Amino acid sequence: LLAEIDAWTRALDPRVVQVSVSLAGSHREVDIIRPDGAVFSDVRPLVRLNVSVTLEENGRRESASAGAGGRAAYDEWIQPGRWQDLVRRALGKASVNLQSIPTPAGVMEVVLGPGWPAVLLHEAVGHGLEGDFNRKGTSVYAGRIGEQVAAKGVTVIDDGSIEARRGSLSFDDEGTPTQRTVLIEDGILKGYMQDRLNARLMGVAPTGN
């Protein structure tokens, strides 16, 4: 399969000078036994396919990649339609990079698209919305439920119940079913992500994240 993707990519664009393709997967069977005697079992497959390309044009080389995956079996991601879409996306981004110019220095507004920019949201905001930090008062969001903590129009949701996505789970590692948890809505802080211990200590329900 990887050799087929490599050959198809090179045939699609004569500027291709390098192709790197990876397919990785894992299969976990999870059993959780809580002190209250509740037992939970789950199967958690995880697959990711990634395509990286390097183009050369007029002596200039630029690279780009595209990847996708989720909680599904390998056959979901080895379909030609799946990997061909990733190849085209990687080639498209590399083509744009060939036309890029140096970014000017200074402070400016930027637009972040979907995908990896969400990691910035996860690190800068997500960890601060975890229940233990807020119970202990060490988060900048502690005690601020109902206050405006972001610009209007900003809504942050944790949802582990979306089917077959990389972060999807039937339940968390304590057996709490995952759900759609609105953390920030239109800039207003609505709640925190809670495990069983901190939910009990704060008098709220666990959120299954």
Specify the residue positions occupied by each region the protein language model found:
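Active-site bordering "gate/hinge" segments
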Residues: 1-180, 185-188
